[in-house]
Design a protein with these regions (language model features):
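Juxtamembrane or sensor-core-proximal signal-transducing alpha helices
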Residues: 3, 99-122
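Membrane-helix interface segments
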Residues: 13-15, 58-63, 214
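Transmembrane alpha-helical core residues of multi-pass small-molecule transporters
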Residues: 67-71, 93, 97, 201
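… and, occasionally, acidic/histidine-rich disordered N-termini of signaling adaptors
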Residues: 118-301, 338, 344, 348-367
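Short, Lys/Arg-rich, polar N-terminal cytosolic tail immediately upstream
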Residues: 1-11
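Cytochrome P450 core scaffold surrounding the K-helix E-X-X-R motif
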Residues: 262-265, 311-317
Length: 367
């Protein structure tokens, strides 16, 4: 509640904040005037002055202190008329002390605010530097060029929403004639998701040479390893497929990931749906794998939810229907051209709305 109220105040125009501070001072002066002489309101005047310094600036704080002094002079003059025995010299001395106290208070608070802002600025610079380094490192983790696969034209891309991505894609050469295609989406955003993504990639690359029993066995091993390394609320959806050039077969496993679309030359669109929960969600899972054959002209599109859940300014989602429509209308294009067309369509749909999630695509076109 308090952070929201502070954020609300920071959004207000300066003149409104100054008016609030000065009205606050006036209200205290009125209470001070009607209160008995033995009651001191000095500590209460600190609050509106602090408000002005913190939300507007030192000049506004000094203005508030000057207005306080003006009210004190006015009150002392009225008190002198009401109490002729009151010594004005003592009153003037008290006024000077109070004014000096408020002026010193304004200066101390202003310096404290400057120090905090400098520290926050330095911390922001350090964070941006770390994010830049992480982004450069992550860029090297993604494939630098499209794989050369006989009978398959492949292209992948990732457009992070916030500097570093929690999405992942990769092309891994296996034994001769076989290639692995991976797409993952780590829950969350920013650096924590990027770190888990790097862990997923490292685990995949180390396990892919050990799992000889197919994609389902690899997914089970990945799930066990990821669950042991992360908290229960950290998980990743994952799609892993192995393309065998000789029989032109695609053997795949889907761990809670968005169902990829497979456009056949006949015009039919098949969905390669989930065959188990996301990686890391539960400790031991027996995943199921499936195999299909790719004929020349078939197009496989693997995507993350940053594509289908992109929203426009009216908060309407791009949706899988639009993606399927683009796939049907442009299935004859190369893998790279189709990737670019999908991303361009998503950005045009958003129409200036901020990108809220990473956009990752892999297109594989049989030839």
């Amino acid at each position: 509640m308090i952070p929201r109220f502070v954020a609300f105040l920071r959004r207000q125009p300066r003149w409104i904040l100054i008016a609030i501070g000065l009205l606050w001072v006036a209200a205290l002066a009125a209470l001070d005037y009607v209160a008995p002489l033995e009651l001191s309101f000095l500590t209460f005047y600190v609050a509106p002055v602090l408000f002005l310094v913190w939300f507007v600036g030192p000049a506004a704080g000094f203005l508030g202190a000057a207005v306080c002094a003006a009210f004190w002079v006015w009150e002392d003059v009225l008190s002198a008329h009401a109490h002729p025995m009151l010594k004005l010299q003592v009153t003037d001395w008290n006024l000077a002390i109070r004014a000096m106290f408020l002026a010193l208070f304004v200066w101390v608070v202003a310096e404290l605010k400057r120090a905090l802002e400098r520290e926050r600025h330095l911390a922001q610079e350090r964070l941006e530097h770390d994010v830049q380094i992480a982004e450069e490192v992550q860029t090297r983790l993604f494939p630098r060029r499209d794989p050369e696969i006989r009978g398959l034209d492949c292209h992948g891309l990732c457009r992070p929403a916030h500097g570093v991505a929690g999405d992942y894609y990769d092309f891994l050469p296996l034994e001769p004639g076989r290639t692995g295609i991976a797409v993952g989406d780590v829950a969350g955003k920013g650096l924590p998701a990027a770190l888990l993504m790097a862990s997923l990639q490292g685990s995949l690359r180390s396990l892919v040479t050990l799992s000889k029993n197919g994609p389902a066995s690899l997914a089970a091993d990945l799930n066990t390893q990821l669950h042991s390394l992360t908290e229960s609320n950290r998980f990743a959806t994952f799609f892993w497929a192995v393309f065998d050039e000789q029989p032109r077969s695609l053997t795949w496993v889907n761990a809670g990931h968005n169902a990829p679309m497979l456009l056949r030359m006949s015009g039919a669109v098949e969905r390669l749906g989930p065959s188990g929960p996301p990686l890391g969600a539960i400790p031991r899972v027996a995943y199921r794998q499936a195999t299909t054959t790719l004929s020349p002209g078939d197009v496989l599109v693997i995507f993350t939810d940053g594509v289908t859940e992109a929203v426009d300014v009216s908060d309407q989602e791009f949706g899988e229907g639009r993606l399927e429509q683009i796939l049907r209308g442009n299935g004859s294009e190369s893998a790279g051209a189709l990737c670019d067309r999908i991303v361009s369509a998503v950005r045009a749909f958003e129409a200036g709305a901020p990108q809220n999630d990473d956009i990752t695509l892999v297109v594989a076109r049989a030839r």
